[in-house]
Amino acid sequence: MKETDREAVATAVQRVAGMLQRPDQLDKVEQYRRREARKKASVEARLKAAIQSQLDGVRTGLSQLHNALNDVKDIQQSLADVSKDWRQSINTIESLKDVKDAVVQHSQLAAAVENLKNIFSVPEIVRETQDLIEQGALLQAHRKLMDLECSRDGLMYEQYRMDSGNTRDMTLIHGYFGSTQGLSDELAKQLWMVLQRSLVTVRRDPTLLVSVVRIIEREEKIDRRILDRKKQTGFVPPGRPKNWKEKMFTILERTVTTRIEGTQADTRESDKMWLVRHLEIIRKYVLDDLIVAKNLMVQCFPPHYEIFKNLLNMYHQALSTRMQDLASEDLEANEIVSLLTWVLNTYTSTEMMRNVELAPEVDVGTLEPLLSPHVVSELLDTYMSTLTSNIIAWLRKALETDKKDWVKETEPEADQDGYYQTTLPAIVFQMFEQNLQVAAQISEDLKTKVLVLCLQQMNSFLSRYKDEAQLYKEEHLRNRQHPHCYVQYMIAIINNCQTFKESIVSLKRKYLKNEVEEGVSPSQPSMDGILDAIAKEGCSGLLEEVFLDLEQHLNELMTKKWLLGSNAVDIICVTVEDYFNDFAKIKKPYKKRMTAEAHRRVVVEYLRAVMQKRISFRSPEERKEGAEKMVREAEQLRFLFRKLASGFGEDVDGYCDTIVAVAEVIKLTDPSLLYLEVSTLVSKYPDIRDDHIGALLAVRGDASRDMKQTIMETLEQGPAQASPSYVPLFKDIVVPSLNVAKLLK
């Protein structure tokens, strides 16, 4: 208390100090005192009121507790009186057991009386129900069946209530109504038959289907009522619950499965297109059935049955099972394509599930895949493996067929521009196109894989093609009379290389997206290289053919016979031009290279004739005559190859200029200028060697040994550097060593 008083005094002092901060506030002390007195009186009044209220509550509570105590005592006394009365009336209650039994018996008899009419008429109702079922009057039959079951179930329930352990009476009642279960089963069979043909029935007689649904719905209500009573009494009549709604969906599901499986009319042995036909029948049947279900069947079923949704799921599951079964068979490559195209594309297309007549109830996005990704992957792997084997076999067969054409006695066909060709490129790329078009129907990814496969196999195929072309050339060289049209078919082989190149580019442009092109492009340089090699070998073989015919005339060059008036170069020009009339059938890129190579080789052979020292001029007159003949023949060759190279837009004079330059060395009349002339020759043609110079001087026939030695030693000190565009002519010309040794002596 003292502590509280001290705190109150301290608080008061603090409040007074807060009020009297300035001198002028002392004048208001009396005013402050009265205000605080009023506050104190107000607080004390509220405090007294609160205390009084608490006291009143305590007083009321004590009064109520006192009343409750009195009530408890009264209840205690009443319970004692009841207990006393109960003990006194036990004997009286036991004497009323007979009354209780009589009441139960009365209840049973009342139920029996109530069902008496039905009990006596059971056989008649059974016959009528059977007749109605046979007549197809299903609703009336079900009404009578319900009456029979109601009578049976009512009697059995009363017996169960009276004596649940009395199985004899229960069996007696059940036996008396024994035909009821048979009628129920017979009616169920009729219902299931209607449901199995529901898609037909709903179009011909929708009322019948509605009757079936009404019967099932009635049975569902009875099942629910009986199950509710079971929770209270434990009694369930025989044959309940029937679960006809669940059985209805089971029947529909089995019907859908049978319908899907029954669409396969053919086998692989009887029809190669069995799977395509099977899948098309499935597509048509499923689409028609779902349209009927959406437009007609939904009108015959209660909304909560969700009949269309359930049928859609049934068809989807049945299709998935069927596709799994088909996928597990040993399918051929074309059959795998047909299956995957149908599963991945057709099924979700407007031809089937996206059909406008099924919208908006069918949402393709919510449907699970018909085949799992694992199965699809396995099928694709099998397809790629089979396709690889097939492509290898097809390419091998195509090449063998083409090889047979190479030995024919007739010329190959020409394209619209007159270039020789065989059917090989067309056959190969037609086969590639077909497989790529098929793969594109399945997916972009598979199309890319097939394209990569085709290009890979094309690479291997071109290597075999190159080997076969080489063998073809070698066999011809062993017997130049066979094959008869060797030149024409070799031209066709060369042209095929260009066709292959163009077809590869076209194929990639058509079937390859830009973003994946980089992954496939590395095969292109390899194939281009092989094709160029094949064409180069082919051109080389054709030129070999030319130079075999020219060999005799080339050997006449730079000989006494040549100097005396041989027409070898005339024959060479005529022969080359004649061959190039055939070579006009070669496509431009390769013909251009071939013309340049023929020009180079003719000039090289001419220079080789010079370097082989077939002639040694004995006088300035002979040197002049020989040199002038060389210049004339160089011009003759220049004219020929200008004619052959017309349209190529290239300078063809350089090679023949070499012959003229060599002729100038031979023609020189002042031996003192020989070193200068030779130096000029070497600077123009850096690949010329000292043995070439020695042979050239030997052909002149007037160079002394010292002059030869001086020229060669001087040239060895400062070899000329070749320009990047220079095409070597002398490096392949071999000078007989015996001749060089003699010259140096």
Curated annotation (Swiss-Prot):
One Pfam family this sequence matches: Sec6
Residues with the N6-acetyllysine modification: K28
Tissue spec: Expressed in epididymis (at protein level).
GO biological process: exocyst localization; exocytosis; membrane fission; mitotic cytokinesis; protein transport; vesicle docking involved in exocytosis; vesicle tethering involved in exocytosis
Paired cysteines (S-S): none
GO cellular component: a single term: secretory granule membrane
Protein localization: Cytoplasm; Cytoplasm, Perinuclear region; Cell projection, Growth cone; Midbody
Keywords noted in UniProt: Acetylation, Cell projection, Cytoplasm, Exocytosis, Golgi apparatus, Protein transport, Transport
MF terms (GO), sorted A to Z: cadherin binding; SNARE binding
InterPro entries, per the entry: EXOC3/Sec6 (IPR010326), EXOC3/Sec6_C (IPR042532)
Function: Component of the exocyst complex involved in the docking of exocytic vesicles with fusion sites on the plasma membrane.
Similarity remark: Belongs to the SEC6 family.
Assembly notes: The exocyst complex is composed of EXOC1, EXOC2, EXOC3, EXOC4, EXOC5, EXOC6, EXOC7 and EXOC8. Interacts with EXOC3L1. Interacts with BIRC6/bruce. Interacts with MYRIP. Interacts with SLC6A9.
Name of the protein: Exocyst complex component 3
Species in which this protein is naturally found: Homo sapiens (Human)
Lineage start: Eukaryota, Metazoa, Chordata, Craniata, Vertebrata
Gene designation: EXOC3
